[in-house]
């Protein structure tokens, strides 16, 4: 990943930005999902299945390689999700070359879903040191496009994706009956979605509703239950029952009237109850499949990757090196710059941290026609701040030439305690935060624990050796 990169136009370079088409619906459609009750294997069990046969979740200790530019396994520390090659460097957010030679200092211990940990061990040289626990399920199911046999969640996805496609209207090029028939056959062949041609008409409201159903459905499986709850109490006895209940922690009492009291309480973790819709395994598998899908695309571009988000990749396109393939089906990649600007390519890319980046686009491929886009989480760019939130200011912060900026946010709508909504003036500090990878010269970054000599560091090393020789003379 790059903190800053400028495309070399003389060499034919471009910066391309692509996004996965309906990432989570696509993994709900095609991903393998476990079913049944798990058989739990504990450490030392000789009957434990081999790594290629795992299908559930695994608690293990692994040592990452030291030369993997794009790590596979996530590791949470300091309230952040890192992708490190060294645990100690990630926990301290080290900015220097890793010096931890002892595997005990570098190893990661955690719980991962089977698709992710199998990718790490079988394809990316992670060393499996110890398996503490394996949840092995009865089997896996997935959608079969040839037989149209549904998997665990594919029937739901096909239903609402058909509604979304129909509410989007016919795509460009479907001007004849033959073109429409070919389009419907193509969607059925690759996505298993049956389109009713009599219902294909633009309906923005229905499209938005079906999109919401597709993207939010799987989240119900992982809904958090250990959160505050509010009740209204009308007599002293009810209040005392709530206060002395060992399963509840009363957090707030708010008198609403002489006869009514609003009580906010939180369940004790040991007494947490599962919801009828909860299935933590399937929520975890959905995000896992999404990360693996994105990783496959990142792996194709390697160190040409400039930036990645949950479902998007920015990378350097060079003559003679393969570009990421584009498509229109679920899980394929779409050209994000082309969708926003038409035929265009990015010239510069700046990364200030997660959801904090900017890029310049040559519209129509003409460097004289440049448009600038800046995305900053928590800041809506309008007339009140567009003179501060600029490409030049972001570049200055990325290059360490200026301090963080305070951005005014006038008339922000905010919720405050007591169920009140207010409008107030506030501000946000805009700053660069690159703490999940180690910054090296020229704007490049590498994972924490990456020890393979990088060209810029090698040049620095050679310069230091030459200076040392001169001083010794």
Predicted regions and their residues:
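Conserved acidic
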Residues: 1-473
């Amino acid at each position: 990943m790059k903190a800053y990169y400028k495309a070399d136009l003389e060499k034919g370079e471009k910066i391309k930005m692509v996004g996965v088409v309906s990432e989570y619906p696509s993994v709900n459609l095609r991903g393998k999902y476990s079913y049944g009750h798990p058989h739990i294997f504990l450490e030392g069990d000789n009957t434990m299945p081999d790594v290629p046969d795992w299908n559930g979740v695994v608690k293990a200790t692994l040592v990452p390689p030291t030369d993997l530019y794009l790590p596979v396994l996530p590791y949470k520390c300091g309230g952040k999700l890192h992708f490190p090659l060294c645990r100690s460097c990630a926990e301290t957010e080290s900015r220097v070359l890793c010096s931890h030679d002892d595997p005990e200092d570098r190893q990661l211990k955690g719980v991962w879903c089977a698709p992710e940990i199998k990718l790490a061990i079988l394809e990316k040289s992670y060393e499996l040191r110890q398996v503490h626990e394996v949840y092995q399920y009865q089997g896996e199911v997935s959608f079969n496009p040839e037989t149209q046999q549904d998997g665990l969640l594919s029937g739901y996805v096909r239903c609402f994706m058909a509604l979304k496609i129909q509410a989007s209207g016919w795509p460009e090029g479907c001007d004849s009956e033959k073109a429409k028939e070919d389009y419907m056959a193509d969607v059925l062949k690759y996505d298993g979605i049956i389109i009713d041609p009599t219902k294909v008409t633009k309906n923005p409201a229905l499209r938005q509703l079906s999109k919401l159903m597709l993207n939010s459905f799987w989240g119900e499986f992982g809904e958090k239950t250990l959160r505050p709850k509010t009740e209204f109490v009308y007599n002293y006895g009810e209040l005392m029952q709530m206060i002395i209940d060992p399963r509840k922690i009363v957090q707030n009492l708010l008198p609403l009237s002489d006869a009514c009291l609003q009580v906010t309480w939180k369940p004790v973790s040991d007494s947490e109850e599962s919801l009828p819709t909860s299935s933590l395994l399937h929520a975890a598998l959905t995000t896992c499949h999404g990360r693996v899908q994105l990783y496959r695309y990142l792996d194709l571009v390697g160190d040409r990757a400039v930036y990645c988000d949950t479902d998007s990749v920015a990378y350097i396109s060079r003559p003679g090196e393969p570009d990421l393939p584009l498509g229109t089906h679920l899980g394929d990649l779409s050209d994000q710059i082309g969708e926003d600007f038409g035929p265009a390519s990015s010239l510069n890319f700046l990364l200030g941290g997660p959801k904090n980046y900017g890029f310049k686009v040559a519209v129509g491929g003409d460097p004289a026609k440049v448009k600038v886009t800046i995305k900053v989480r928590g800041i809506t760019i309008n007339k009140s701040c567009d003179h501060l939130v600029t490409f030049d200011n972001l570049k200055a912060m990325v290059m360490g030439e200026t301090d963080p900026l305070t951005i005014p946010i006038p008339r922000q709508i905010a919720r405050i305690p007591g169920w009140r909504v207010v409008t107030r003036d506030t501000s946000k500090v805009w700053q660069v935060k690159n703490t999940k990878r180690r910054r090296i010269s020229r704007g490049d970054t590498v994972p924490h624990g990456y020890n393979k000599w990088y060209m810029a560091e090698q040049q620095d090393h050679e310069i230091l050796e030459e200076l040392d020789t001169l001083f010794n003379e």
